[in-house]
From Swiss-Prot:
Belongs to the LipB family. This is Octanoyltransferase. GO terms for molecular function: lipoyl(octanoyl) transferase activity. It comes from Francisella tularensis subsp. mediasiatica (strain FSC147). The active site is at 168 (acyl-thioester intermediate). It is an enzyme of class 2 (transferase). Disulfide bonds: none annotated. PROSITE patterns: BPL_LPL_CATALYTIC, LIPB. GO terms for cellular component: cytoplasm. Catalyzes the transfer of endogenously produced octanoic acid from octanoyl-acyl-carrier-protein onto the lipoyl domains of lipoate-dependent enzymes. Lipoyl-ACP can also act as a substrate although octanoyl-ACP is likely to be the physiological substrate. Its EC number is 2.3.1.181. Gene3D superfamilies: Bira Bifunctional Protein, Domain 2. It is found in: Cytoplasm. It catalyses: octanoyl-[ACP] + L-lysyl-[protein] = N(6)-octanoyl-L-lysyl-[protein] + holo-[ACP] + H(+).
Length: 206
């Protein structure tokens, strides 16, 4: 496997990072290194390519951005650890389903290893849950064997805006965050811990 370059973008507007992902993916060559971007976004709702407007109950003036990722509407905001995967999955001999399961399993492993939290998935409702409350959302896009978008892990944030929508298209879905279980939850640590688990799983799968 080629080296994966890791870049910490800090706090960035969603639209800027989305445009950068599109440009990176469209201009990369077979020799381009894979990258993982670590980022935090100001408050924004993002609507997946099959997202339904009725799942946004009241935006409360929070911006809404249409994207080309999978899934329905979700919320990003300060205190949420976001990780984007810009990978050549064809070169890595990694199918779309395997990528999704690796993204999910890395989060489950991280929560267990570093925080002693037993997380799980729910069939038909992608994401990571603790006691059936969603702690992480994921949405990916694969174009010509190249992936972008990623996972958002609720870490230490205001969860209120999730009540303004039907998260991921599910009415009444309860959300949680790492700070509910670990008061000193820090997004930088979560991003590094998650990335380490993801890369380990990725290397073991190819």
């Amino acid at each position: 496997m080629n080296n994966i370059y890791q870049e910490d973008l800090g706090l960035q507007q969603y639209t800027k990072v989305f445009e950068d992902m599109l440009e990176f993916t469209s201009t990369r060559t077979p020799e381009t290194n894979d990258e993982i971007w670590l980022v935090e976004h100001p408050a924004v709702f993002t609507q997946g390519k099959h997202g339904k407007p009725e799942h946004i109950l009241n935006s409360h003036n929070i911006p809404i951005v249409a994207t080309d990722r999978g899934g329905q509407v979700t919320y990003h905001g300060p205190g949420q650890a976001v990780i984007y995967f810009l990978l050549d999955i064809k070169r890595n001999k990694l199918g779309a389903k395997k990528l999704v399961t690796t993204v999910e399993q890395a989060c489950i492993n991280m929560l267990d290893k570093y925080y002693n939290l037993k997380a799980h998935i729910i069939d038909g409702a992608h994401g990571i849950y603790i006691n059936n409350q969603k702690i992480a959302s994921l949405g990916l896009r694969i174009k010509q064997g190249k992936s972008y978008h990623g996972i958002a892990i609720n870490t230490n944030m205001d969860l209120t805006p999730f009540s303004y929508i039907n998260p991921c298209g599910y009415s009444g879905l309860k959300m949680c965050q790492l700070a509910n279980f670990y008061q000193e939850a820090d997004i930088k640590k979560v991003q590094q811990q998650y990335t380490a688990e993801f890369v380990t799983l990725l290397n073991n799968s190819i």
